[in-house]
Amino acid sequence: MTRRPFRRSLLLAATLAVVSLRVSAAVPSSQKTEKVSTFGKYSGYSEAVYDGWVRSSRYVTVRDGTRLAVDLFRPTRKGKVTAEKLPVVWTHHRYQRALREKGKVYTILDSFPWLADVLRHGYVVAAVDARGSGASFGRFEGMFSTHETDDAYDITEWLGIQPWSSGKVGMYGRSYLAFTQYLAASRKPPHLKAIFPEVGGADMYELIYRGGIYHGPFIEMWSQLVRELDVDKPALPVDEDKDGKMLKAAVEQHKANRSAADIFAALPFRDSVDAASGVQVYRDWTPITFLKEIRESKIPTYLLDGWNDRYVRDEAILFDNLDNPKRLTIGPWTHTQSDHLDFGAEHLRWWDYWLKGIDNGIMREDPVHYFVIGAPKATAWRSAKAWPLPTERRTKYWLGAKTLGTVAPTENGAEDEFTVDYSAEVSPDPRWGLGHDFPELSAHDAKGLSWTTPPLSGAVEVTGHPVAHLWLSSSALDADVFVYLEEVDEKGESRYVSEGMLRASNRATADPGFNLLGLPYHPGLKSDQSPLTPETPVELVIDLYPTSTLFAAGHRIRVTVTGADKANARTPQQAPAPRLTVWREAGRASWMELPVIGN
């Protein structure tokens, strides 16, 4: 992926969302097609009987009187809109449903090119500007507010009763547009029959304060981006707005939008209350709170994510907690990458089954598909009947004298010490995939401590959720601890595999009230915060983002610990910088637990 300024690439990704998606080729209705329905491949079960579409736009008024801008795409034959009642698939858009850029109009079909094939197969496609954004009226109150969720219900039901609708509605979209699907499902709208959230999250607190550490750089960038989109870079007006006065009036309301960065900076704990709204944002505006309601909805849910995306942990947890009809696919992607799979085929298989009643076999397949990074291309995609994989062996790799191995320490007094280097960083959040790659990590590793295995005698597959157990002390009252899992090749170059992080004062654990796959749950309540006693060791349990990686024979596995991640986290800087000590003695052993597959 080419490098470019982060802000510009984020803006382009959010507004145009032009990603490298494979588009299923349309099959003429006169051509007999072999029936194929397997993971990533689909033909012969439904035909591309339409040859085009028409776009229209209008306002729809929701329950509180707010007008939302809606784009509708309806299939055509020989230029004539079909009179057939068809299923509808829609997205609740935060980054403008349509815009004009350098004289060209961009719509949702540019963001998701495979939707053109969905239209040809007999679906109505819709995109709706969220309140306070695009051409919609209203005010942005914060991410996934109660009003936004009300809107999702109202739009779903409006789409379900239109004369051109079959009454069966689905949802699609990635990132913010995936969160909104979970929240829509939690309201159980009668016409919502299937959702397909891509790279979406479940726990807002873990997104903003992962391990209790503020992810400020990204949320500040995001807030600036949406401010520009909402106020300075207007969306395309709806058809009825011939003179642009409606759009101008909507943008005037957007000027009262709240800043997400201002909201979250003032809410450092899971139970923090937003002063302006009186809401516990991390409780009331986040999907994980509504697991019970989403389960009760029974709405079929296809979860899709990437190993190098920031939300992959959440998607795996959601999948395991839902008893809805469900599927989980995890590929070799960051937040914005989309290769190695025909996304259009998977969406069409899902919607044909649930919105048209076509028995294409998708529900008889293994429910989990995952890509093993580093495996031969022919065998990289694999399937399983459950997540985590039933075949995983939780294997402890103990920290030694710069070594990492499977033999527990027996000596006493063993420890490693370093001074926090606040310049440490991997890259400006490469998990978003917005122009920043994962660099070679040797220089980064030198700013902390590393422990490395000998060269592997054979390949080792790690598929699942790594967990670090560290005994750590500090010369200060707190510490931000960043843990990295890496693969080191024969030349000594180190490649990023995964990471986890935890503020030491946020180390308390509790029962989350749902299945967290055996991972540590740090509740992050204000009352849970416990400062360190200088030079007194405490145990930290830190889960890393899940991965599926084949460590090659001859390569080495490395664990690195640093005390900062400058580009991605707001770690308070102290002078002098504190010393951190990682203990690895018999009574206070530290280790990395890896989910090893096979021998």
Predicted features and spans:
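Accessory cap/linker subdomain of secreted extracellular hydrolases
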Residues: 28, 43, 108-112, 120, ...
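C-terminal, loop-rich substrate-recognition/catalytic regions characterized by aromatic stacking residues
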Residues: 28-30, 251, 338-599
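N-terminal cap/lid segment of alpha/beta-hydrolase-fold proteins
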Residues: 39-84, 452, 456-458
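Cap/lid segment of the alpha/beta-hydrolase catalytic domain
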Residues: 79-160, 489-490, 518, 566
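Short beta-strand/loop motif that positions the catalytic acidic residue
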Residues: 297, 303-305
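Conserved alpha/beta-hydrolase "acid-adjacent" motif
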Residues: 310-315
